[in-house]
């Protein structure tokens, strides 16, 4: 099946292990900006705001970055799952414009997107009860959120190689922007490693495609 081929190729194109912490930081930074912007935009219309299962009763005290680092530490899913989860979140935003990502739902959307991504991408993954514990919610809530999320993205789980690479490039730009303001990161190594890995994987993909074409 086509989606199985895409899964295999995406796993082959995982970000290099040494830069994954920076990928997590970049994703956190993007989601932080989105949630803060939507908080400001929705404040005048708070009384008419649509409520969903993703909205927490109170804003979680843990930061988005710390929350994602916790998931990264304990979920033990493949690195590509986080890129795919990011893609799923974007699909959710596009398909559910009345449920923008904000500080009340971003944490639950993150844990759910990673769960759904891990189940689709990885051969082995933890169950909902484990993810619920990592995410600080009940298993019943995790089950409900998973179902709501799947319906929210229209069950569009497959990710093409080109889409995956586009989002990798987006995160790469975010990582580069962060290095401009943080002397603790190493921009030259970061960009070179990420770009080299993408080029290698794109070459491998072209090589596979040529083999498939010659075999037909």
From Swiss-Prot:
It holds the Pfam family Cyclin. The keyword Cell division applies. GO terms for molecular function: protein kinase binding. Expressed in roots, stems and flowers. Expressed in the shoot apex, leaf primordia and young leaves. Coiled coil: none annotated. One of its GO terms (biological process) is cell division. The keyword Cell division applies. Keywords: Cell cycle, Cell division, Cyclin. InterPro entries: Cyclin-like_sf, Cyclin_P/U, Cyclin_PHO80-like. Interacts with CDKA-1. PANTHER family: CYCLIN-U4-2, PTHR15615. Belongs to the cyclin family. Cyclin U/P subfamily. This is Cyclin-U4-2. The gene is CYCU4-2.
């Amino acid at each position: 099946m086509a989606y199985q081929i895409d899964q295999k190729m995406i796993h082959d194109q995982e970000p290099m292990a040494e830069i994954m912490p920076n990928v997590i930081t970049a994703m956190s930074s993007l989601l932080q900006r989105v949630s803060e912007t939507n908080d400001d935009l929705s404040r005048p219309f708070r009384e008419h705001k649509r409520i969903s299962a993703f909205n927490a009763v109170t804003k979680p005290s843990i930061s988005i970055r710390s929350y994602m680092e916790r998931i990264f530490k304990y979920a033990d899913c493949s690195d590509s799952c986080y890129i795919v989860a990011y893609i799923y979140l974007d699909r959710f935003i596009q398909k559910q414009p009345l449920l923008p990502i904000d500080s009340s739902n971003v944490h639950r959307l993150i844990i759910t997107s990673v769960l759904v991504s891990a189940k689709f991408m990885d051969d082995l993954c933890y169950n909902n009860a484990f993810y619920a514990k990592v995410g600080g919610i009940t298993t019943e809530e995790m089950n409900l959120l998973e179902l709501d999320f799947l319906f929210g993205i229209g069950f569009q789980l497959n990710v093409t190689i080109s889409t995956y690479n586009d989002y990798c490039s987006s995160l790469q730009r975010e990582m580069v922007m962060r290095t401009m303001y943080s002397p603790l990161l190493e921009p030259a190594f970061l960009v070179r490693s990420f770009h080299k890995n993408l080029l290698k994987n794109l070459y491998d993909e072209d090589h596979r495609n040529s083999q498939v074409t010659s075999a037909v």
